[in-house]
Amino acid sequence: MKNEPHHVSTENILPDKQGVASFGTTDSSERVTYFQAEDVLVSNIRPYFKKMWFATTSGGCNADVLCFRALDKKYAYLLKSIMFQDGFFDYVMSGAKGTKMPRGDKTHIMLYPIPLFSETQLLKFIEYNKISFGEGGRMRSLSRVSRKQRYSTLDFPAENRVPTGMQNSPESIKAFAVFDVTFNIYS
């Protein structure tokens, strides 16, 4: 695995949810979590920097980068949109351990309250993302608008949130973290 061309560490991910600057390298002695396109990678060191990347390719990341994946790819953008909210990073910081270089607590992160969506809302969200990002790529015409501006319009009211461990979710819309902890999205 020496010189993996798509290796991501906390140093490669840009602050304020701006993606990844470049890819690093690793050697065979480093433990690597493999990620796929449309996974959400989040730096777990100093979560207040809000380092997040919605992967556009596959590769590997080190243990300081958390990798989240929607089990059903059609919900990948929904997962990204939920995690893109500043409230997600505020929540991570509320359970972080350490003062000089705080780290998110994986168990705490997996209890992040996820909005409840009706089937109609889920279908509208999926259709919007087909138009915006995939089929036709209309979002490219909005390239002058920052990612932060585009996603700040997605509001997930607090009254529609439930802790992830409190309900069973349909198998089709579950997501999981690649570090072997379940992360559920409920409908």
Model region roles, listed by residue range:
Residues 45, 59-66, 97-126, 131:
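A short glycine-rich beta-alpha junction/loop motif
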Residues 10, 70, 114:
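Active-site donor-binding loop signature of nucleotide-sugar glycosyltransferases
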Residues 1-7, 93-96:
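Short coil/turn segments at secondary-structure boundaries
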Residues 6-7, 99-100, 111, 142-148:
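Juxtamembrane/interface motifs at transmembrane-helix termini
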Residues 88-91:
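Periplasmic-binding protein-like
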Residues 116-187:
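Amphipathic alpha-helical coiled-coil/heptad-repeat segments
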Residues 3-37:
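Sequence-specific dsDNA recognition surfaces
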Residues 33, 40-86, 106:
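A short beta-sheet element
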